[in-house]
Amino acid sequence: MMKLALSQPPFSGTLLMLVVSILLLWEKAASIPACMVEEGDCWDPLQETFNSAIQRAETLCNLADQLYVEFYQNQFSSRQFADLNSKLIKRDETVLKAGIYCHSTLAKPQTRGGNFEIEEHLKMLINFVGSWISPLFHLVIELSAMEGVPETILCKVKDLEENNRQLLDDLRWILTKVSPTAEIREEFPSWEHLSFLKSSNKNNKFLAMFNLSNCLDNDTKFTLHHLRIFKCLITGKDC
């Protein structure tokens, strides 16, 4: 059984506020059927959707980590990424921004003061995951059109794009079950490096990939961590 450490940085403040909200969550969960009888077994659709979402998030974490490593090691991109990393160390302004700033930060779930609403946090997580829909879609298109792209890289990017879309669908469904009357405005932050990716200049394309691989590696871990917390608090499982 996985233990969720309340002291684990940097999410400790979030976890404490989540715990404060747990009674409200259980009250909402009481309106959701505990399970459905299917072939003699009790099947909980909410728990199963959480399992699906977490499995997809784990897949995204693994793929993002593998893609990050491959960009540095594969002959297709290793020289360009080494050059970009060197410029990052030298604090080149353009590369520094690409290396540390992520567009998804604008949608990142955060707590403000002592107020925390599980419904609002889920909505923010939906927009956070949704912020990767466009970048991954366009990355698949651009890599498919580039010459010399290894199949291993292209396959990973396609799998990332597919799993991210399916994870977003899982989150949307979970929100409708936890808060049936919830209304959400999906506002996915735009990716400012999209123009670099679509540029005819190869250096610009690799700069966009540099930004994407750095941010995606961190964001997938953030998403997985929060999904595990939500499953524990909403379903009472795997705490």
UniProtKB/Swiss-Prot annotation:
A Gene Ontology cellular-component term = extracellular space
Q: Which organism is it from?
A: Rattus norvegicus
Cellular location(s):
Secreted
First and last residue of the signal peptide: 1-31
Please give the family membership noted in the entry.
Belongs to the somatotropin/prolactin family.
Q: Which domain of life is it from?
A: Eukaryota
Q: In which tissues is it expressed?
A: Placental basal zone cells.
Q: Which gene encodes it?
A: Prl8a4
User: What is the name of this protein?
Assistant: Prolactin-8A4
Which GO biological process entries does UniProt record here?
cell surface receptor signaling pathway; female pregnancy; mammary gland development; positive regulation of lactation; positive regulation of receptor signaling pathway via JAK-STAT; response to nutrient levels
Q: Which residues are glycosylated?
A: N211, N218
